Amino acid sequence: MSRFTFKQFHINQDSCAMKVSTDGILLGAWADVKHCKNILDMGSGTGLLALMLAQRTEENCQIQAVELDPIAVKQAQENINDSVWKNRIQLIQTDIQHFLQTTAQTFDLIVANPPYFEQGIACKNEERELARYTKQSHLNWLEWAATRLSENGRISFVLPYEAGKTLIKSTALFCIKQTNVITKIGKTPQRMLLTFAKQPQVLMQDQLVIYDADNQYTEAFIKLTKDFYLKF
């Protein structure tokens, strides 16, 4: 699908390596945006997360989206320019680590749908490989993000379930929210939505089931994503 149309914006993705995914949509709808004035989207791809978060936040919230791949940057800029939030989203083409080491800005929310496929799986093109693979671990991404987090800020990731469990054990940050994502009722969790903070808080844990036993979307999934999907 070369274009993915949402209720308030669209994503052109014909030349971008990584397409719109349920993972990204879940994170964009799930991340806590309360009291956010500055948001960072790490590894923006098509610009999906930046646009979803722009839709969910107030006009005074500014969003910076960082992406290394020049082809993805070109397409993301087109998507942003076609939206009503183009004046609130700044797209930056650079390496994430370099950006975080050089910016003076701190962020109230940092989001990422990071690469998680292991090295060694063949990809058809270099751009897709760049988007899917990383020599850096999820812990690296989290630690880099933490350096530019405001005192009461939050970092939210979507990860494979086992990778999420590993990250929670590995970081010195506090996991304050965890949602285990189950594709269909009765199955084991496949994904994990996580929020980390510098300060300890009571951990909020729950689960989200996407499909019920009749292969229909659950009420919880519809409630979470209804502001975006045309079908709801």
UniProtKB/Swiss-Prot annotation:
Q: What class of enzyme is it?
A: transferase
GO MF terms here are:
nucleic acid binding; tRNA (adenine-N6)-methyltransferase activity
- Indicate where this protein resides in the cell: Cytoplasm
E.C. no: 2.1.1.223
* Keywords assigned by UniProt, alphabetized: Cytoplasm, Methyltransferase, S-adenosyl-L-methionine, Transferase, tRNA processing
Q: Which InterPro entries match?
A: DNA_methylase_N6_adenine_CS, SAM-dependent_MTases_sf, Small_mtfrase_dom, tRNA_Adenine-N(6)_MTase, tRNA_adenine-N6_MeTrfase
Establish whether keyword Transmembrane is in the entry: no
What reaction does this catalyse? adenosine(37) in tRNA1(Val) + S-adenosyl-L-methionine = N(6)-methyladenosine(37) in tRNA1(Val) + S-adenosyl-L-homocysteine + H(+)
Give the UniProt family note: Belongs to the methyltransferase superfamily. tRNA (adenine-N(6)-)-methyltransferase family.
- Protein name as annotated: tRNA1(Val) (adenine(37)-N6)-methyltransferase
